Amino acid sequence: MMDFGLSDDQEALQRAAREFLARECPPALVRETAKTADGVPRALYAKMAELGWMGLVVPETDGGLGLGTLELALVCEELGRAAAPGPFLGTQLVIAALLRAGSKAQRRRWLPALLAGERFGALAYLEESDRHDADGIALAARRTRDGWRLDGTKLFVVGLPGADVLVVAARSGRRGISLFLVETAASGVRVRPAETIDVTRRVGEVRLRDVALERDALLGKEGAAWPMLAHLLDLGAIGIAADSLGGAERALEMAVEYSKVRQQFGRPIGSFQALKHMAAEMVAEIEPSRSLVWYAAYVFDKTPAEAPRAASMAKARLGEVYSRTVNRAVQMHGGIGFTWEHDLHLWFKRARWNEVAFGDPPFHRDRLAELDGY
């Protein structure tokens, strides 16, 4: 049975993460990083790596902390609270792919640099069809004498252009889906940043034109990668849901703090009933959402068969809760809440991207209904 609370060690991890990010990742750093070419605050990620965050779920034998997805979700939650920039989640998905299907040689090549915060990764799966299932994958992989050739385009790759290695989903043959490790510096790979509303994290498009890969670029078995890709997409959905939870909590805190100092008619605006009710509605939505996120992260490790359903519940719920929470926070601030000068807009815009990343709420509700046989 799951204990509906965190262990002492988990609470300590979350508390330490919150304190670290409050100190090392203030809004000023988020703004500065938004102006850089790749959107990666490397000094911050070096410190995160020293804390072991890049290898939270990696076994100790491979240089990690040997923790679970719930601990990873707690760190994602705090990254969302800080609106932290950089390719953390994308790198975790590449690490998860290596742990699940990587050969010893692939692990030796990539894990040390990824865990040290020296290299970063991203999952490239979404295409022009905007589908999150196997039928949406058209990028072609064909065998050659020396290995493979890849042709196609991936859109909205979270973590580009800062990623060094991609896990690319490709169609090999008529029905098979295969995953490949592709370096962004390889010949024939073109990365183009994509503009989105969210300035706190980067997204890009990657075009592969007759990209030659060696045999050992294949992750796992040829044509049998859809279950693993679905596993990675569930992990991505849980990570984004956790990020949304932390962001919603921070937006609520900012709104309440502002309502205590902003005066109207000789009294703090937080004393007015309408704003009290608005804050109460925010709390009432956030608190039960926390259980969905933690449960999804818990069953991802403990009861994998339940993970798709739990991931969709968490992602569908948190996508909307985060957006509604920041909307209300902006209303409580008035017009200043959406100006560039006020930090709240960073969370407002991040919420919009989180809502659609790894499947929007309608997609996950449809998926949940299908999983439940409706």
Indicate where each model-derived feature is located:
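Alpha-helical interface subdomain recognition
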Residues: M1-G86, A101-Q106, A113, G117-E118, ...
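Short glycine/proline-enriched turns and hinge-like loops at secondary-structure junctions
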Residues: L67-G68, D133-D135, G159-A163
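Short beta-strand-to-turn element immediately C-terminal to the catalytic PLP-Schiff-base lysine
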Residues: L99-G102, V168-R171, L181-E183, R207-R209, ...
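A generic local secondary-structure boundary/capping motif
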Residues: W110-P112, S129, A138-A140, K154-V158, ...
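A short, Trp-centered hydrophobic/proline-enriched beta-strand micro-motif
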Residues: G117-E128
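Flexible, small-/acidic-enriched active-site or ligand-binding loops
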Residues: H132, G136-A138, F156-V157, E183-L218
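Cytochrome P450 C-terminal beta-domain/meander region
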Residues: D133-D151
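A short core secondary-structure module
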Residues: T153-R190
